[in-house]
Amino acid sequence: MSVWLLTDGGTDAHASPGHPERPDRRAAVADGVRDVVGDELAEPPVEPIDRRTVELIHDAGYLDVLKDAESRGGGWLDPDTYVVPGSLHAAELAAGATLQAGIAAATGSADVAFAVIRPPGHHAAARRGSGFCLFNNVAIALAGMRGRGVADRIAIVDWDVHHGDGTQAIFEADPSVCYASTHQSPFYPGTGGRDEVGSGAGVGTTHNRPLPAGSGDEAFIAAWRDDLVPAIADFMPDAILVSAGYDAHRDDPLASLEVTDAGYEAVAGMIGVLSAQLGLGGVALTLEGGYDLDALRASAAATVRGLLAGRRSLTEPD
């Protein structure tokens, strides 16, 4: 089975001393993928996203705000989200890598394509960045895949400990996008209740399963097994994109869920099986949160193992 790792050291220019969203996160996750796949891993070069594709999601005025902040030597979009010289190029690489991963998986070039990038993206909305995020990488990738005729009905799986408020807001009225999320609640950003099910024509395509602090593998796995994976199956997507955050891990310093590597492997296995059942070419992932380096490495490795095992269970003979 083919695995792609899409990562680029150019994203490391986006850094602020003492900030938890730091460059060595990328290295830890990339090492986790390499641990599992070894010499058979493909690492194609990353191509930065073009502005036209970014503007399918983000307002041009917001992009100008980012560019202006860089030109002034940097600044803060909110108390959590910084811009420094090099941040805009890092965001372009992050979105570009996520689009490459999405295309590789949707076309069958890779069974698993993991964009190991930063800054993360799922809190970024059309006109603002927040929660460490500048561009909404998964949203831009989805729009780019559609624009290139690669996929039309797309499911977004989000297991970050924080609800992906930006992603949900962008697609909640779109009936051709299914958004499924587990996240800690109550917690930042304060959205993601079970009653948030989409709006307008998109009612019924948003699925939130908030988990209380202290929840571990049992609750995490059950939410996906019993509710979210069946909802995605009923939606019948022709591509799956995963917002892979690992801050629900029990060792993460910024949250209070108790998920382990085994929990991520189990849920990834379900997604792998589902992708094979649907006849999809593969599964694409993009890095979101996660701030303990050892947990990041182990969880990324567990995710890739789970996805490959799930896909093999249906695509390879005994």
Regions found by a protein language model. Give the residues of each.
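HDAC/HDAC-like amidohydrolase catalytic core signature
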Residues: 1-318
